[in-house]
Swiss-Prot record:
Organism per entry: Neisseria meningitidis serogroup A / serotype 4A (strain DSM 15465 / Z2491)
Molecular function terms from GO: porin activity
Sequence repeats: 69-70, 71-72, 73-74, 75-76, 77-78, 79-80, 81-82
Gene Ontology BP terms: monoatomic ion transport
Entry protein name: Outer membrane protein class 4
UniProt cross-references to CDD domains, sorted A to Z: OmpA_C-like (cd07185)
Gene that produces this protein: rmpM
Pfam families: OmpA
Bilayer disposition of the protein: Multi-pass membrane protein
Region of interest: 7 X 2 AA tandem repeats of X-P: 69-82
Annotated keywords: Cell outer membrane, Disulfide bond, Ion transport, Membrane, Porin, Repeat, Signal, Transmembrane, Transmembrane beta strand, Transport
Keyword Ion transport: yes
GO cellular component: cell outer membrane; pore complex
Signal peptide range in chain numbering: 1-22
Amino acid sequence: MTKQLKLSALFVALLASGTAVAGEASVQGYTVSGQSNEIVRNNYGECWKNAYFDKASQGRVECGDAVAAPEPEPEPEPAPAPVVVVEQAPQYVDETISLSAKTLFGFDKDSLRAEAQDNLKVLAQRLGQTNIQSVRVEGHTDFMGSDKYNQALSERRAYVVANNLVSNGVPVSRISAVGLGESQAQMTQVCEAEVAKLGAKVSKAKKREALIACIEPDRRVDVKIRSIVTRQVVPAHNHHQH
């Protein structure tokens, strides 16, 4: 083959090769290896771009010519299930506060002592709370004296205490008073037995004094309180939800 023909053949081969590379490069914007089909890099690890490269449309992240798309935001965790609070039906709570007649009144008297006024004022503050449903004031006496006398004395004492509580702010609509006389005296037999042990040498006056002291718990005013309590309860299965 002549020298001219050899040159012509080489030119055609180069031209064909160049066309192929150019055609492939024009699609990707980078010089691509015909063997591995991967972007050719120089000694510095940089991607080789060709004349057809357009950064806006062809830039690649691995070549530093594009910014990676942000990762999608993680799905928010589902909100915890609301805690259901069940309000129970109102319940009644009954309580009795026993006030010694000795601290409230003089013996056989129905007028309040000075120190009793202060104690009843404190009690009235509690009885004025909104959850108090009702207040029943019960007057009691010991067995000494006639039934009729004791009944009247117990009523007077109950009314005196109830009126004092009302004057200190307890709503009159929730308070009542009743006298029960000696009907609920509990110390009679015990105290009579104790006094009998004193023997014949002890005078009647001393025995009477001892008996009066012994049956002192029967001389009392009971304040019976009924309160309404409403409790809020979280069902057990709510504690296991996450």
